[in-house]
Amino acid sequence: MSGNSFAYSEQAGGGEATELGQEATSTVSPSGAFGLFSSDLKKNEDLKQMLESNKDSAKLDAMKRIVGMIAKGKNASELFPAVVKNVASKNIEIKKLVYVYLVRYAEEQQDLALLSISTFQRALKDPNQLIRASALRVLSSIRVPIIVPIMMLAIKEASADLSPYVRKNAAHAIQKLYSLDPEQKEMLIEVIEKLLKDKSTLVAGSVVMAFEEVCPDRIDLIHKNYRKLCNLLVDVEEWGQVVIIHMLTRYARTQFVSPWKEDDGLEDNEKNFYESDDEQKEKTDQKKKPYAMDPDHRLLIRNTKPLLQSRNAAVVMAVAQLYWHISPKSEVGIISKSLVRLLRSNREVQYIVLQNIATMSIQRKGMLEPYLKSFYVRSTDPTMIKILKLEILTNLANEANISTLLREFQTYVKSQDKQFAAATIQTIGRCATSISEVTDTCLSGLVCLLSNRDEIVVAESVVVIKKLLQMQPAQHGEIIKHMAKLLDSITVPVARASILWLIGENCERVPKIAPDVLRKMAKSFTNEDDLVKLQILNLGAKLYLTNSKQTKLLTQYILNLGKYDQNYDIRDRTRFIRQLIVPNEKSGALSKYAKKIFLAQKPAPLLESPFKDRDHFQLGTLSHTLNTKAIGYLELSNWPEVAPDPSVRNVEVIELQAKEWTPAGKAKKENPARKFYSDSEEEEDSSDSSSDSESESGSASGEQDEEGDSSEDSSEDSSSEHRSDSESVSEVGDKRTAKRNSKSKGKSDSEDEEKENEKSKTSDSSSTDSSSVEESSSDSESESESESESESKKVTMEKEKKTKEDRNLTKDVSLLDLDDFNPVSTPVVLPTPALSPSLIADLEGLNLSTSSSVISVNTPVFVPVKTHVLLHRMSGRGLAAHYFFPRQPCIFGDKMVSIQITLNNTTDRKIENIHIEGKKLPMGMQMHVFNPIESLEPEGSITVSMGIDFCDSTQTASFQLCTKDDCFNVNIQPPVGELLLPVAMSEKDFKKEQGMLTGMNETSTVIIAAPQNFTPSVILQKVVNIANVGVVPSGQDNIYRFAAKTVHSGSLMLVTVELKEGSTAQLIINTERTVIGSVLLRELKPVLSQG
């Protein structure tokens, strides 16, 4: 509910913003002749000033107006720099609207969005679930490959979030990341597998959509979650229901046997009834085995049936296609009424529904016949709907209802919509061919239409009559004569061509009319359409072969006209006919068979439904609508002959609960101990477990929550009750962890220790009944109290030690390490004496954390001599400029990178006043230029220094290098390795800092190279050549460490190269500046891999 309420509040905010935007637009009054064109510019400047204001109310008003502009489709991209500054605002309402804006424009303004990536990372830990989800949406909207590792880690973290709304957005981000980098597929499948186990209805639809996009072939991931998805289906949001139903349809076709076998078996039995072979009887007996539907198959059909009443047309259509594809034929009929109900929706929904009904009506006429009148055409229907309804009526036509339908069609022919009228005539022709009883009636009705005033109706009637006459040509000579008279009045090319073809095919039956028609056509040959010209040529050839005396000269005249026609098809057909019907010395053997070729009996055309071949596409899909396979279409598989093992869908609920709530699956040891508690404590425990189960879907990583992360997360939540509950859970988890690691004691000792630990935990907060029960099995009350006190101290010390070890372990696994921004925090433990060993250890840790004096900037290990071209002498008209990075601290500022530029005069004249101007720097970047050079002698050279603050990014610094006469546009783009300063530190400090920079602050990759490339000298030379880093002494021969800090922010950059077995090594980079770390990793990997 919380996720839904946040979603609705976000939509409500958008609506309010739209209203405010409209009010703001209406108040802008144009001033002067150009007010209409300057109002937008003035309004945007006003918004920028409001966003830079110190008042939150002004910023909030500005953001509402901006979001309103976006809602109305206006371009607000130029406000991106001003909006992104407020991404770290403390006002939650402003922050929400800023994230709404960033999701829209992050992909367009990638460079500016990358500058705020650290803010997005911090927002992933925000106490507000909407902010965490919005930060993930923005992060996944930045379509830059270098942040793929960051997105991957953020998705993993969000998939274990306590909020189902955040987990839902994690599922959405999976699809975006997969489209950006398909190589992450295996890691994303792990997250999908985890989210599929989620019990929240808010997450189910989104994760199934991610499953369909990333790994639709991994059916094994669905087995254990099949029944859960079926049971959750009714409560999932509407669009999630659509996705899940389509996926389960495909799943059912692979896991269950066909429910249609029973009907097929009956048909076979009817055939075998008349056969007397003994072998055939044995086969018949085998087929008589009754079909038993799988319970899981029945579960799916039963749970989707209520969704036929859904208000969402897509859900109803999804259920309908599911019933059509996987349910027994006797049960499909229940979808008819729901589909007919959808015909009251808008025209777009009607179009899709009618297309699917048209496909169904071909195979199951009886299912839709009771609703025949629902498909009658209305005058208000658009043409596309009318034609689809005609198609359905044609498919449903039979001897019983054809008279009613023909009266309906007679009305449709008179429609003002000519396209619809023509389609109706085609429908009448199809009815005439499929129902022999009304063939003559339809033909006579079509002949009457030949005298219609509308030329399109007459032309379509001619085409349909031509097809009907092909079936019974000998009986309709009078109709052909009547159609020949229409040649003078019909101008539609298709109709004229059809009449000529009919006369040509029946030229022997109308021997007096055919030559005269050819004479008329020869007069107008040059003005006819190409389709008509082809039929004139065919008519001439047929008459030449049957009535050569009357038509020989006329045919030769037509052939001469066709020989010089502009269309090459006409010329080609003319040459072909001439060689075939006019024999000469070069004529081949085919001339003898010309009459058989031209006057052969043609088969009658088949008037079929255009939806006949669409049944192999899944109903309701884009491929079915287009009648062609669309990109991303997943085909339905054939039913398996033998059902796969159904036990793969069995889920052992008890074992899952034990694994989810205990550190090492010790449920069997916990249950006996619980029996010693009083009834009141059992009630409290059950209430705690029930309250915790509400967030069970979010705590997929149970061990991390039990080892302390849940207490840190919950400390940021506004609910104090939730915080206390999670702390108590973490305390119990810590005690169980300490108990689990004390392996030196025997089984009975460990059980006694467990009882006393539980007693010491509950003695302060609950009644003394439980302690008295435990004391009855031991000695006196005083002895038990002293023993419990000493044991509690001992266990507390062991627990403190184990907690610190567990924290070091979880830092390697955790995705979002909160220690990056906070000092080392003490774990949550039971009350202990003031000077406990754990406190002393924590104080020592705090003292060690202030080690800034130990880490200091060092001199560079290596300075490459490689120079970069700043200005070529040809482009600079004789002035050439090169630059390189001396890897020294900049004298112009601590945050600037030092750059030395060498200027050369390659001309034979003096170049004067060399200076820099026209700086075009990205936001936040600064430049300290060199002093102007008065003159540079011919063939002279000079080296100058300058400093640029690149803001820890590899963005290009653009400026103009000018002389007295010219200005040249130049750029400096720093390699990522030159944005660092080498640092000297000990191995101990390196490991400590590295331990604090884990999770999202760590990127790694595997390197494969020849063994000779992994020697210490080669690795050192390659690393320091790419990056300005210092060498950290290492006590291990297979690990090489390098350290540096970024010039602008001073963030540590720790590089580790760890040699593995064989010819592989692991490259690890730890830094808060994750973008720079990813770029450095990408540059170091090919260098270390190559020989």
UniProtKB/Swiss-Prot annotation:
Organism (species): Canis lupus familiaris
Keyword Magnesium: no
Record note on modification: Phosphorylated on serine residues.
Domain of life (superkingdom): Eukaryota
Family, per entry: Belongs to the adaptor complexes large subunit family.
Topology of this chain in the membrane: Peripheral membrane protein
Keywords: Cytoplasmic vesicle, Golgi apparatus, Membrane, Phosphoprotein, Protein transport, Transport
Residues recorded as bearing Phosphoserine in the entry: S276, S609, S748, S750
Stored SUPFAM superfamilies: ARM repeat
Complex and partners: Adaptor protein complex 3 (AP-3) is a heterotetramer composed of two large adaptins (delta-type subunit AP3D1 and beta-type subunit AP3B1 or AP3B2), a medium adaptin (mu-type subunit AP3M1 or AP3M2) and a small adaptin (sigma-type subunit APS1 or AP3S2). AP-3 associates with the BLOC-1 complex. Interacts with KIF3A; interaction is direct; interaction is impaired by pyrophosphorylation of AP3B1.
GO cellular-component term (any): clathrin-coated vesicle membrane
Known role: Subunit of non-clathrin- and clathrin-associated adaptor protein complex 3 (AP-3) that plays a role in protein sorting in the late-Golgi/trans-Golgi network (TGN) and/or endosomes. The AP complexes mediate both the recruitment of clathrin to membranes and the recognition of sorting signals within the cytosolic tails of transmembrane cargo molecules. AP-3 appears to be involved in the sorting of a subset of transmembrane proteins targeted to lysosomes and lysosome-related organelles.
GO biological process terms on file: anterograde axonal transport; anterograde synaptic vesicle transport; intracellular protein transport; vesicle-mediated transport
Residue stretches of biased makeup (Acidic residues): 679-695, 703-718, 776-789
Signal peptide range: none
High-level lineage: Eukaryota, Metazoa, Chordata, Craniata, Vertebrata
Region Disordered, residue ranges: 1-32, 267-290, 664-807
Biased composition (Low complexity): 763-775
Designated name of the protein: AP-3 complex subunit beta-1
Subcellular location: Cytoplasmic vesicle, Clathrin-coated vesicle membrane; Golgi apparatus
Primary location recorded for the protein, binned into one broad class: membrane
Biased amino acid composition, Basic and acidic residues: 267-288, 667-678, 719-736, 790-807
